[in-house]
């Protein structure tokens, strides 16, 4: 399980930036997420025909960030992650709809990003303070 500081940070945010790469060309997209604490994974909704999902289906190794936007160096917080994207099922749909009940009306395709590595930067704990998570 991730350190409590990761979980606390992720609970205060709701958008991740997802990076994909196909044919040596990177791409990025923003996605609303629900975070599954027990399994260290993001649950997102996105149409399978979007560029980022098409690329992730070709190459499921993805990376991304969740950040706090601030101009104050002492308040910088952010998480970088690497993981693997897979299509979600009923459990992932339940988790996502718990956070975003209005999404039911759109009946989106649900995906899970299994976090294999993450780094959390939190300058409030001291400049350059970083925590790391690696899935075992």
Which residues does each PLM region occupy?
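Extreme N-terminal tail/first-helix region
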Residues: 1-16
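Hydrophobic alpha-helical segments typical of transmembrane helices
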Residues: 2-5, 52, 92
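Short secondary-structure boundary/capping segments
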Residues: 7-8, 34, 54, 102-103
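Short beta-strand segments
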Residues: 13-48, 56, 62-67
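Short acidic (Asp/Glu) patches
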Residues: 46-50, 63-68, 90-103
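Helix-adjacent hinge/juxtasegments
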Residues: 52-83
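Charged, gly/pro-rich active-site loop segments
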Residues: 73-136
């Amino acid at each position: 399980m991730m350190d409590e500081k990761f979980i606390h940070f992720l609970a205060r945010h709701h958008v991740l930036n997802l990076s994909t790469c196909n044919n040596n060309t990177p791409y990025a997209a923003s996605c609303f997420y629900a975070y599954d604490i027990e399994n260290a994974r993001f649950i997102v909704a996105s149409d399978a025909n979007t560029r980022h999902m098409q690329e992730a289906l070709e190459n499921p190794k993805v990376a991304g960030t969740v950040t706090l936007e601030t101009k104050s160096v002492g308040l910088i917080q952010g998480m970088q992650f690497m993981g693997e994207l897979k299509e979600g099922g009923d459990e992932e749909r339940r988790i996502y709809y718990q956070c975003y009940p209005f999404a039911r009306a759109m009946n989106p395709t649900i995906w899970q990003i299994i976090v294999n590595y993450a780094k959390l930067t939190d300058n409030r704990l001291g400049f350059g303070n970083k925590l790391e998570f690696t899935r075992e």
